[in-house]
Amino acid sequence: MALPKIGYDIGNEGVRNNCFCFLQDHFEKHPDRACMKWVNTKSKLWFDYNPFARTLTHDTFTYKNIHDMVVHVAAGYKKLGVQKGDCALVYVPMIPWLYAGMFAFQMLGVRCIFLDSFARADQLGYVADLCKPKVWLSGERGFSMGKGQPALEAIPVKINMGPCTKTWTARFEDLLETPEAAEPVAVAQEHTALITFTTGSSGTPKGADRSHRFLAAQHYAIDAFLPYKESDLDLPVFPIFSLNNLAAGVTTILPAINVAEPADNDPYVLYTQITGENITTLTLNPSLLNGLNKYCLEKGKTLPGLRRVAAGGAAVSRDVVEEFAKIAPNAELVVMYGSTEAEPMTHITGKEMLAQRSVTETDPELVDAGVNVGHFAHGLQYKFIRIVRGPIEVASDKQWAELEVPQGSVGELLVAGEHVCRTYYNNPEAFKTSKIRDHNDIVWHRTGDLGRHDEQGNVWIVGRIHNVIERDGKYLFPVQAEVVLKRQPCTRLAAYLGVPDPKLGEKTVCVIAPKDNADIKNQKLCAERETEIRRVMDKNKIPVDQVIFHPDIPMDLRHRSKVEYGILRDELKKSGLV
C-alpha cells in the first residue's frame, strides 16, 4: 500500500507528520544508495597545498549509514533528557553529521534552530535569548564564541561535534555509539521542526518557524519544478537544498568550499568536484555561478556532464546567463526567486530569459528596468501593493482594492500558500511588520521586494522596499542602475543607493569598487570613468548625483550577492564621502 504524503496525516498528531519519515522511507526502499559524499579535511588540505593536485577524493555515506546514525544519536539525546517540545541550537558547518544531528532532533519532536556558520557571537546570543534552547550542538569554536553571552552560557546541555580540548555535556561521536535506537514521535502538522533566520539585511534577523507540514510542502513545491532522476548526483551550496535532497532520495555531494568565507580558488574546487564526481545537477548562488563562468571561460573549460543548474539567492543578469550557456552547453539553467520565508516563489529558465525581448537588443548600452524572475510557482497566491512603510491591516476586500496597484505597475510583492512560512518564532512584532492576516484568515507574507507583473505572467524585480530611493518626489530603484554599473569594464562590485539631501530628500550615489584598487588614486582615470558612467546612466534615464570609487562594497554573508546598503551608507558617511 502506498504511504500517505509526509505532513498530511489525518488527526491532530501522527508519526507520518514527522519529516523524519522522508528519510525512513528512502532507507527502507534503497538502503545501499549513496546518500552523501564529501571531501574530508585531510583530502582537502592535500588538494589545497599540492600544486599538482587535479582530483578530490570523496568519502560516502549510504542512506542506511545516515539512518542508523540518526536513530542512535536520537536515543543518545533522550538519555541526556532531550525531549519533544525542547529547542536545540545547531551551529555546525555543512558536513554529513550536521544532517544526522538535525534529523535526530526532528524525529524526537525537538525544535531545531539552524544558524549559518558565518553567524557572529552577538547573533548567536540573540537567537539563544529569543528561543531559549535546552541543548546546543556545536564544534568547540562555537562554544568559545558563547563566552560573555549570558543566553548561550545558560544552555544546560552542550554537545560537542569534532575535536575538543574541554569537557562538555557530551560528545556527538559518543552518541553515535548509543546501543539503543529511537523511534520517531507523533507530532501535529504545525509542530515546529526547524527555525531558520533571515540575514537581517532589513533589520534584526527573524526566525522563520518551519513546521513539519511546511517542510513537507516546501519539498513538494521544489520537487515540482526541480524534479530529480534516481541517477542524479547533486551538489547544493544551500543547506536547505541538502535537506530537500534527503527528502527526495537524491545523492548529495557536499561542496568542498567554505561558503561563509569565499576564496579565490572556489570556482576551481567546484569545477574539480563537478568533473571528478560526474555531477549532473548543481544548486548555487549567483556569485558562485559568476565565478564558475569566469573560471571556465578563462581556462577554456566546459562542463558537458551537467544537465541542470539552479541559481538562487539574488538576481541573475542576462549577461551571466549568456556566459553559462557557453560553458555548459547541455545544461538547463533555472533561476529561482525566493526567500527564507517562501522558497520557491518564481522560477525562469535561462532559455526563457534570453528569448525575452530586451532593450539591449536595440542598443547594448541600454538595460531593462528590472530583472525577469519568471512565473509564479504552482499553488502560490500573490498580490502587488503600493509602497507602505510600516504594518498593514486588512479587514475587507475594499481595503485590499485600495492597497493593490494596477496590473503592470511597481509594488511590493505579497505571497501566500502552503509553502509560505506563516509565522516567526516567538516574535509577534516581526509578524506585525512582515505579515498580513486578512479578513479571510489568509496569512500573506510581505517579501519586501518591489516588482511588477507583466501581461505574459512574468515577474520583474526592481529593488527592495528598504532600498528604494525617494528623490525629488519620485521613486528610484537600484537593480537597473547596478546592472549598468556592473557592465563597466573597470567594475568589480557596484551599488546604487540614496543618502539624505536637504533639497532632493535623497540624492543618488553610484559606488564602484574597481577591479584594481590602485586605480582609485589615479584622479585623471577616475574622472574619465565618472564621465563615462554619467553618460551611460543618463542614456538609461537614471539620475546620478554623485560617483564614488571605493575599495570595497559590503555584501551579504549568506549569498555574497546582495549589497549591504545600510553598512555601505554608514561607511561612506564615516569617511566623509557623502
Question: Predicted segment positions?
Answer:
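Conserved AMP-binding/adenylate-forming core of the ANL superfamily
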Residues: G14-V15, C35-I95, Y99-F103, R120-G125, ...
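Conserved pre-ATP/AMP-binding loop-to-beta segment of ANL
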Residues: A34, K166, A170, L176-F197, ...
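ANL superfamily adenylate-forming
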Residues: K44-T55, V135, R141-Q189
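Conserved AMP-binding A3 loop
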Residues: T60-K64, A193-Y220, T251
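AMP-binding/adenylate-forming catalytic core of the ANL superfamily
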Residues: A119, W136, T272-T275, L282, ...
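Conserved AMP-binding/adenylation subdomain of ANL enzymes
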Residues: A216-L233, F238-T281, Y295
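Conserved AMP-binding/adenylate-forming
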Residues: E322-M336, T340-G451, E455-N458, I465-V468
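Conserved C-terminal "lid"/linker of ANL adenylate-forming enzymes
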Residues: A495-P500, V509-V511, T531-V578
